[in-house]
Amino acid sequence: MFDIGFSELLLVFIIGLVVLGPQRLPVAVKTVAGWIRALRSLATTVQNELTQELKLQEFQDSLKKVEKASLTSLTPELKASMDELRQAAESMKRSYVANDPEKASDEAHTIHNPVVKDNETAHEGVTPAAAQTQASSPEQKPETTPEPVVKPAADAEPKTAAPSPSSSDKP
């Protein structure tokens, strides 16, 4: 894989022994071996997934070819019934779109006035006197119901705080 010969591997081992020492070298070798093992398993997993995806794609392509071939070799009666089913499905779609309650509620909440892009067009036909009349017209206040007034009870006496004992009360 890396095209490393025995002499190069021996040189790396000796350098590692000098740098890490005899106590830490086995731990470092185990760690590096674990990394290499993890990378190999990852590469194998990716390769297997790609192979499965390619097989699945080939299967789907062949299935589409078979479907096209079977549609062209259908009897005229089956073709006629398929056309009738398609027409029925299209008419159902059209009737659903026409009677869509969600669309009707959306239409009810839609503002149909076009957006005015030009400021002069928006104020066309409005004179200062008309604007003053609109501005000075009384506002309509919403009707309010009178709220009931709560009266305090006559027999209820206001509570007073009890006097706290002071230092002069003590003997």
Swiss-Prot record:
Membrane topology, record value: Single-pass membrane protein
Highest rank taxon of the organism: Bacteria
Endpoints of the signal sequence: none
Transmembrane intervals: 1-21
DNA repair recorded as keyword: no
Family the UniProt entry places it in: Belongs to the TatB family.
The protein's name in its UniProt record: Sec-independent protein translocase protein TatB
Record organism: Escherichia coli O1:K1 / APEC
Annotated gene: tatB
